[in-house]
UniProtKB/Swiss-Prot annotation:
This is V-type ATP synthase beta chain. Produces ATP from ADP in the presence of a proton gradient across the membrane. The V-type beta chain is a regulatory subunit. The keyword Metal-binding does not apply. It comes from Clostridioides difficile (strain 630). Belongs to the ATPase alpha/beta chains family. Transmembrane segments: none annotated. The lineage of its organism: Bacteria, Bacillati, Bacillota, Clostridia, Peptostreptococcales. Keywords: ATP synthesis, Hydrogen ion transport, Ion transport, Transport. It comes from the Bacteria. GO terms for biological process: proton motive force-driven plasma membrane ATP synthesis. Pfam families: ATP-synt_ab (PF00006), ATP-synt_ab_N (PF02874), ATP-synt_VA_C (PF22919). PROSITE patterns: ATPASE_ALPHA_BETA. GO terms for molecular function: ATP binding; proton-transporting ATP synthase activity, rotational mechanism.
């Protein structure tokens, strides 16, 4: 039996205090019935004796303390799953917003899920092709990996996100592939861009999209990534699909967490974020991976904008501790019209060595990757020297490297947001660029690969 309480003590912003409650649990959902019959939803943040602190999903305007009633539903926030969720667009709270019919769920799953038991994890080892050379060739994404994209305000991370969602595929397997895309705290314009691009390119057919707008409540923003991960877990571990989860923007998520924490008057941590920000992010990121005995997998690409392009800001800093690398977008490359502006030198995929090589990409992948990194790094150094001392101060070989760095950015990194390159095309472009340098400089490439793959003049 569901009890109703008319003992609302206080309302402060999005928070409400209720006295005299019994059997109420943390994270439990509730309904507030206003005097005019309107229903608003809430969830329990804290229980102390017979007093419950709840947070409203909607505005607290119009709540009359004496006449409003509260009832608790005995369950936490959940999402109804079935194979029909593919091809659909949902709100941040899991309601269809694409004009289609309601989903008839096979079951309802708690959105908080559970991180994968470390003993049950399988090591990521299979290549995922994104069609983006700077990722596939140099910072390879591996199935089951967590690889964030660190962007800055005004950089085209939204375009890169939809490009990866549209192009990503698992090669050489009959396994089904799906994308779960969660847009957190975005504008109407961005929401329209994401949804129209998914529909125009047909990517929507293999995708589940969750959209939380900037004017939606902060508590909904905190729930949206977990809705997406619940859908991903169902598709991966019950439907045996390989799922790529893209969440943009984690910064908006953390801001919402800070807002909720401030409303609860919690002691703030670094820069006002709650002290449990690291733990909270880990409960999301660690839901990605592969499990022994399961065909499916969850690969995650969280995207975040670094405030003031600061890599030491708590959000990118803590994200870097939990995830397996990072892809960094560069404002300098963006100004040169390099699209996507991925700065490959500070970028890193810690699991890339496990997903490349013979039988996965190609036997020469590791050698060309190492040589391209080394040559581009030296080319950047040569260009810095040229800017200080002038071109005449450089040796002939340094001039070659400086030219290589320019061509590398134009030909390899820059490909636009509509070009889908196979790994073979990416490797061929790499070999073509390396042919600009004399063989004596290519010390990281084995002779047999040089003879086999170097383009003949």
């Amino acid at each position: 039996m569901i009890k109703e309480y008319k003992s609302i003590q206080e309302v402060a912003g999005p928070l409400m205090l209720i006295n005299g409650v019994e059997g109420v649990k943390f994270d439990e959902l509730g309904e507030i019935e206003l005097s005019n019959g309107e229903i608003r939803r809430c969830k329990v943040l804290e229980v102390n004796g017979d007093t419950a602190l709840v947070q409203l999903f909607e505005s607290s305007t119009g709540i009359n303390l004496a006449e409003s009633k509260v009832r608790f539903l005995g369950k936490s926030l959940d999402f109804g799953v079935s194979p029909d969720i593919l091809g659909r667009v949902f709100s941040g709270m899991g309601r269809p917003i694409d004009g289609g019919p309601e989903i008839i769920p096979d079951k309802r799953l708690d959105i908080n899920g559970a991180p994968i038991n470390p003993a049950a994890r399988d090591y990521p080892a299979e290549f995922i092709q994104t069609g983006v050379s700077a990722i596939d060739g140099l910072n390879t994404l591996v199935r089951g990996q967590k690889l964030p994209i660190f962007s800055g305000s005004g950089l085209p991370h939204a375009n890169l996100a939809v490009q990866i969602a549209r192009q990503a595929k698992v090669r050489g397997t009959d396994s089904k592939f799906a994308v779960v895309f969660a847009a957190v705290g975005i504008t109407f314009e961005d929401a329209e861009f994401f949804i129209s691009d998914f529909k125009a390119t047909g990517a929507i057919d293999r995708s589940v999209v969750f959209v939380n707008l900037a004017n939606d409540p902060a508590v909904e923003r905190v729930s949206t990534p977990r809705m997406a991960l619940t859908a991903a877990e169902y598709l991966a571990f019950e439907q045996d699909m390989h799922v790529l989860v893209i969440i943009t923007d984690i910064t908006n998520y953390a801001e919402a967490l800070r807002e909720v924490s401030a409303a609860k008057k919690e002691v703030p941590g670094r820069r006002g974020y709650p002290g449990y920000l690291y733990t909270d992010l880990a409960t999301m990121y660690e839901r990605a991976g592969k499990m022994k005995g399961h065909e499916g997998s969850i690969t995650m690409i969280p995207i975040l904008t670094m405030p003031e392009d600061d890599k030491t800001h708590p959000i990118p800093d803590l994200t870097g501790y939990i995830t397996e690398g990072q892809i960094i977008l560069s404002r300098e490359l963006y100004k040169k019209d390099i699209q996507p502006p991925i700065d490959v030198l500070p970028s890193l995929s810690r699991l890339k060595d496990k997903g490349i090589g013979k039988g996965k990409t190609r036997e020469d992948h590791a050698d060309t990757m190492n040589q391209l990194f080394a040559a581009y790094s030296r080319g950047k150094d040569a260009k810095e020297l040229m800017a200080i001392l002038g071109e005449s101060a450089l040796s002939e070989i340094d001039l070659m490297y400086a030219k290589f760095a320019d061509e590398f950015e134009k030909e390899y990194v820059s490909q636009g947001f509509r070009t889908d390159r196979t790994i073979e095309q990416t490797l061929e472009i790499g070999w073509k660029l390396l042919s600009m340098l004399p063989k004596s400089e290519l010390k990281r490439i084995r002779d047999e690969y040089f003879e086999k793959y170097m383009p003949k003049e």
